[in-house]
Amino acid sequence: MRTLKASGQWLDAYGLWVAQHKELVPLLYNGSFDDPFEADGFDWEFTAAPRSRAGVLLEQEAVARRGLVLDIEFTGRSFTSPIVRQYLFTPPGTYRVRGEYMASKLRSDEGLAWSVQCLSGSKAVAGRTAGLQDTGGVWKPFEFEFTVPPDCGPVASLQLEPAAALEATIGLKGHVAFDAFSLTRALPSQ
């Protein structure tokens, strides 16, 4: 699948992904972060760096009454953005992403943002959250809508990045965790 994705053969890659699962695959895979990450498919992806030089330490961590969550520790060093992403096979239309997050001692001027970006056509940002700031260790919900335009191509990227791109170069400090993600097609307004 890695080769198919790298060469832009998204339909073939996604077809192979679905065939391997032998069951209905949701629009957003592993949104609860409870399953181990599946490399090279349409699950969560991140760039691994040696622990001693990493600006981001990312793992799945067990949390009481939640199961596993996506746990991210910022070390103060620079890092590659996006921090984590999932390729979404989404036809044109409007969608809603919902999730929960908790941030503790997060030192960031503008916070973190989830965005959806087209991979072809204009490569436009289809939607983005406001900056997610420190919550003092309390879980809070977030949501945003995005619209996939017809020229977006078959795949878009849901990705986490600093709301201010410069902060990837400067580095961040603190801890953030994510859980309970869902992606649904938004109903037209009446």
Language-model-derived ranges and their functions:
Residues 1-190:
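Extracellular and organelle-lumenal recognition/adhesion modules and their flexible linkers in secreted
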